[in-house]
Amino acid sequence: MEVILLEKVRNLGNLGDKVHVKSGYGRNYLIPQNKAVFATEQNIELFQKRRAELEKKAQQALANAEQRAAKLNDTTIVISAMASDEGKLYGSVGVNEIKDALIEKQIEISKREIVMPEGPLHSIGNYVVEVHVHSDVVANLQVEIISAK
């Protein structure tokens, strides 16, 4: 199925690109999330008329994401967790704990923006966690895990 992207989609294309996607991906994700429309003649003409408006909206979203990333890059969060004498945690520190610590600092973030490719953290120490605030903007958040005794 052919669709026209209304915003940049990671690993697919940019605003205004006409791309071929599987029917399920288009109908169940891209179109309901307003990330794309069917590539009909009528939609192509409508998109050409709205292109400047959509590009301006995308630029505003990018500028907003860069501001959030700058704030996150300057932030260090400290998470206290129960740990053994060797520094191993009794459990782990994952996305939920990081999100809760950021909310305590009045920084709004969603769980899906936090990326931990190696999985949850299992020991005391300092870590850098990636936060994908936009498809083009990645912030590095400093996380310090200390022992709660």
From Swiss-Prot:
Name used for this protein in its record = Large ribosomal subunit protein bL9
Enumerate the Pfam families for this protein. Ribosomal_L9_C, Ribosomal_L9_N
* Keyword rRNA-binding assigned: yes
What family classification does the UniProt entry report for this protein? Answer: Belongs to the bacterial ribosomal protein bL9 family.
Q: Which PROSITE patterns match?
A: RIBOSOMAL_L9 (PS00651)
Tell me which HAMAP family the record gives.
Ribosomal_bL9
Q: Could you tell me which Gene3D superfamilies the record lists for this protein? A: Ribosomal protein L9, C-terminal domain, Ribosomal protein L9, N-terminal domain
Q: Name one GO cellular component term.
A: ribosome
